[in-house]
Every structure is written in C-alpha cells, then in structure tokens.
C-alpha cells in the first residue's frame, strides 16, 4: 500500500518530492495511467501521478519527424494530433487509448506493430529528467568524446557517466553481457536494464561513435531518473491500402510454425488469438458481431496484415502470402479482410484481453507470464515445451498476441483461491523463466 499519492503541478514540485523522499529514505513510484500488468506502477513508497498536469506537447518538428512531449500524454491522443501531418508514434499497445508515453518509455512498450515499427526504446531520442539529487539533466545521443567529457563533471550527472564507464570498460564485463543477455535478434525485451545497448558504442567494443543513456532509461520502470519530457522519433503513417489475412489453424503449434513462413512477407501485423480467447467473445454482445471472419472452430488464428500504396499492389502481397502458406500446408482457411472490417477484427483482438477476466467460475487466466520473448525460430519449440510443462501439471493456458515478434502472452488458468494453485502459480512462472533462458 502506498504511503501517499502526489499530483505534482510542475518540475519544482517533483524536485521537492525527490528531496523529501531522499531525506526520509522513501521510494518514489512515477506513474501515468497504470495500465501495465506486472506491478510496475505500484509500491510502498509515494506514488507520483504525472497523468494530471504533465500532459502537454512541448514542441513538434514536422520536417525532422520528431516531437517532444510530457510523460502524461495519452498515446492515441498524441497520434490524433499527428494525424493531419501523416505521422505517428508507432508502438501500439492494446491499451493505447489510455496508456501514456511516460509509462510506455518506462516499460519499453511495443504492442502489435513492433515487427514493423520497433519498440519504444527505438523511438526515444532524448529524455529530460530530474535526478535523485534534484538536478535537471537531459540524456541524449552524444559522441564518445562528449561522453568522456561528461565523466569529468563534478556533479551527479558526471558520476553516472563515470559509473557506466567503470562498469563496462572491462572485456570480462562485456563478455558476460553478451553471454547472459538475450540474442540481438530478440527485439522485444523489457527485462532489467538494457546495458547491452551500450556495447554498440566504440567506447565498449562496438562500432558506433555515439552513445545514448536515454536508451537505458527506456525499460527502467522509473527507477533511474524521473522523466519530465521525452523527445520521440516519429514514423510516416502506414500505406493507405491494406489487407488483413485471418489464417485459421487446427493447433497452436501449427500456427507458430506457420509464423516462420509469414514473417518472410514484410508484414505490418502478425498476431495470434487462441480458441479460448475467441470463445470468450461468443457471448459478448459488443464483440459477437466482430466474429464474422471465423470459419468452423479454429484452435488458433493468425492476423496477418500487408499494406501498399495501391489496391493492386496489396492484393499481390496478400495472394503471395496465402499461396506460400498453402504451399507449405499451413492452415485450413485464409480469409482476406478489407476496409473498415479490418478494425472490427482488431477490436476483437483488443477486447480479448479484457474478456478473459469474465471467465465463469473461480478459475481465471492469470497474468503472470506476460512478455517472454524468444528468437522467432525458437518459438514453436518454446511453446511446445511450455505446453508439455502445463500438461504435466494438468493445467491449461491462454496463448495470444505477438507471434511475429517471438513473444506470446501466456496465461495459466488457475484458481488462486486454492492454496495448491497458488503453489502452482509460483512453480509455473519459475519454470517458464528457466525455459526461456
């Protein structure tokens, strides 16, 4: 339970909160919308809401395709502002109509578009922060020489640069990071601090003549500095013509093997829904009408989106994708979805997460394995081994989300009112962590 909740009106208020917390040895928990699922925005210190007063767009450079915002701006509202300029902020979570940029940076959020537009860390250019001593510091891309100059500063900022250098300059540290951190091909990763980003710099054995500490703040969940302004790189909006192929499969494993084929096709979306999620929508008045694309009773459906600047081009892309799946004997039905119907399918996919909470009875799909990611080529084997583990415990799970990125959200169906299922909760999560590793 938090000790207190604060709603700072300006940067001076944040500095006062930091001074008070430091003096009294209390933690601060920066918080925006609180839509994350793993407890990142709760704690026993002072919860600091920036969602009320830090909601402004500070600057916008249309030519450079960059924008600077305060952390409390909502992701979809930002994109509504950018729409007339045919630009947008790419990372797209299922909570995009309420999640905020500060939280997305803290979590290194990604969402359904990451296979095309990357994750939040990729879009962060600089972050204006308040440090633990109350000083105001901007972290941005700087040259290796500028990094060394920062190390000479007799300030808290200088001590940060010195600490980074002293930790990473040794070959042994660099080798340990390379050994223990995820493969570079695993793009979706928000576990721990992204110190492996620094190994790209020529300071630490890489080839880049620059380094950016803001990349470390992305995914740090507000533990390193208090963000007050964030500069983002924007993307041009998706080509105007798109087709969504809804590929139906008789098993989860078949759909994941098919993903290896689909990802050769320059997709904009590659998302998985399993039978359990689809079944949750049957009796929902709002979503039942969005089930129009389903044929028979698939165990899994992949949502595969292609896009181009003309309908002729996009039809060729869609037909090539379907032909490739059929040639490799994957799936039993591949329906092409057009126009406004595409958003209806995505609405069903987004609603699925919330509808899981309406499962009848005490058994619920428990959010405890949210962002395990593996290399795409390892995904079928990983899920096969996870399913075998669940079978050994005589348990079922929900499988959904970001197949094309090698990240499936897995939700064991447990009754946490029963002691034995609470024990299983711990066993399943621990064994899954080892399995991913």
Predicted feature locations:
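ATP-grasp fold ATP-binding core
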Residues: 28-31, 270
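Short, hydrophobic/aliphatic alpha-helical segments
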Residues: 14-27, 82-99, 103, 192-217, ...
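Phosphate/pyrophosphate- and phosphate-bearing ligand-binding catalytic cores of soluble enzymes
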Residues: 143-210
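N-terminal glycine-rich flavin-associated loop
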Residues: 1-28, 46, 50-95, 105, ...
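A generic beta-sheet turn/junction motif
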Residues: 41, 62, 403-405
